[in-house]
């Protein structure tokens, strides 16, 4: 079970004032379960772990294995919630260094930006390798993945001819949209994105599960982790004993005290993309109506040598939440040397994991002493099962926190602003007048 440790944060809290935030958080949790709050049409994720059908899990595993058996590389095309969840789990659980082969393919991502060098080099890399594609898009019209899929579909057809379609799996709408039509015409295997689950809450749908299965991750264990924590979070009505409600209360309390930035920190580089996924989850869910905590992330100890100075002595507008797995399976032991030229013999006999843990504790003490409240999210280890717990915990916490803030945690109206400008500047049909106006603005006219 996940635990929220507050030993380096509680001294920053006025207990009487905090009571009202606990009450509000539990009220928001009840609103969530009433299905009467803002955005309630997108609550399909709430009970999803216990509603996933075994037949769908089995189909995902079987289709993923077919691609694994025929591919040295699988390219996952998506952006935002259509890619960050699966990448977070893959980066956390797969070996840092591994050899790929048919049956154990490399996983690369595309369609999450518009930079041409990356796509060009990836396409060149694939020319002499067998590869397949999982394209993920509800509509099929999101610019970045749509462009990437056009390029990789052309490469597949050139390389495999009539059999190219067998190397594409499309995760999209059940019945409508550009990608669904494309899939029907070409005969792609498809999986469905539920209508009542938004992208950033979709890691437990085929959006997240298929790429995990394609990488060889045991998705049943990932689902099991989310199922286990769901039972606890849904049942516990005491906001102090429910870690998600407790976390939400702390977040909004610190915001009320002028701490507008939350840093999600880790001491394990494999967790970096958990932070990237978390930033989208909270940023899109809470950043609206001129409200919200800005979600940032840091990778320690690396960033202690760059941003650590600001955290220690900069403006006191921060609080930290530290991802803290209890077991990191460290087996590197530091041995003494006869000459001790590097002056490190004082560490002899210690595992590198022990050294990292002392760095973590020393950092928490220093930051708290410097005026930065630090929460610790304690979970068992960096395994698919534990990550299933962590990701459902954050989804549940985010919904509660958003309701406490008074916003709809399930929409993202602001993301269309840049798209409209981009379409106008690219002369998309229907945007011509806006394009002329924007070009004049850019030129200062």
From Swiss-Prot:
Catalysed reactions listed for this entry: alpha-D-glucose 6-phosphate = beta-D-fructose 6-phosphate
Subcellular location(s) per record: Cytoplasm
GO biological process: gluconeogenesis; glucose 6-phosphate metabolic process; glycolytic process
Active site positions: 284 (proton donor), 305, 419
GO molecular function: carbohydrate derivative binding; glucose-6-phosphate isomerase activity; monosaccharide binding
Organism this protein belongs to: Leptospira borgpetersenii serovar Hardjo-bovis (strain JB197)
EC number: 5.3.1.9
Pathway terms, separated by semicolons: Carbohydrate biosynthesis; gluconeogenesis; Carbohydrate degradation; glycolysis; D-glyceraldehyde 3-phosphate and glycerone phosphate from D-glucose: step 2/4
Sequence similarity: Belongs to the GPI family.
Record-given protein name: Glucose-6-phosphate isomerase
Role this protein plays: Catalyzes the reversible isomerization of glucose-6-phosphate to fructose-6-phosphate.
Disulfide feature: none
Gene name of the record: pgi
